[in-house]
Amino acid sequence: MVAGLREKPVDQIVACSQRLLMKLGAKGELLAFGPVVDGRFLAAHPSDIFDLKRAHTVDYLLGVGNHEYGFQLPSQYIRGFGRGITEDRFLLRMKKRMNAVYPMSVRLNGYVYSQQKSNLNNIAAAIRRVYREEYNPDDPHALEYQFTHAFGDQMFVAPTVLVASKHAAAGQRVYLYENQYAPSSAAAIRPDWVGCDHSDEAMMVSGAAFLDVPLKVGALLPFCSDDKRTSLSMMAYWANFARTGTLDCHPCRMKMYLFSIFLYPRNPSDRTGGPADSPMVPEWPQYTPDNPAYMKLDVTSSSDVGLKPEKMRLWNDVIPKLAASSKM
């Protein structure tokens, strides 16, 4: 089969991949990913592409929310979500996830993975050691809360940090963030224990807080003053990065070029066209191998170093080694 695929032209593989993803989506496989991104065929696993120094030379801005699997996704995929779980259920769900991530006889990051029961038990024990200090094993809701963090860390945070590290190690400029601000309209319809869910920052970056966003009931999506203030800051960062490819600046007034295009009239005395109330934003440090800095985006943003280091070590180093039956 592999020999036959190698004889196929890339265009045909790309077209077939798109059709395959559509079929999988129709069957409910919403998280199916093929070897094609934006119409380009990936000749190797993304991790190997980085290691082979074949990744594109581009500046990279990437990040996550502080509760990626907090509410939106588990509510869709887990029946009875929000009622609490037992510790056995916590570990069973993580085992099922690991069994899907490391299927039998697949080479990934230089390792060969198997579905051996002992491996899964060792992985579950490692997860429990890292996360157990943060939950009460006798509290079903605390267990479910910690499950959402463990699952989100594995699915979103660890891959993001891994890519940031590999791209920075290749000498590229990388800027990492953890979103810590949820729009008021989203927070109002979630339990109070949910943090910043998957894609919460999208509304802030897009300037939705300054637009009339209609709801199905005929009203407009409400936004508060903190929403608008945070949105201005995020748009300032993103607009500057889009224009210059960098966020390496001293605390200064960053003109909102993209924002001004659709909201503010041009000022003849100011060729940039930025609004008069462009926000003061703190410096966003570059992420490097020696200084894995990241920005904590909030009403008042601040920088820090090392995003969940113990948990990232678990997902990106400890578990891959535990899952490997042998190293190639």
What are the roles of these predicted feature ranges?
Residues G4-K228, Y237, L258-P265:
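Substrate-gating cap/lid region and adjacent catalytic-acid/histidine neighborhood
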Residues R40-F41, D138, A142-E144, A158, ...:
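Alpha/beta-hydrolase-fold serine-hydrolase catalytic core, especially in secreted/extracellular enzymes
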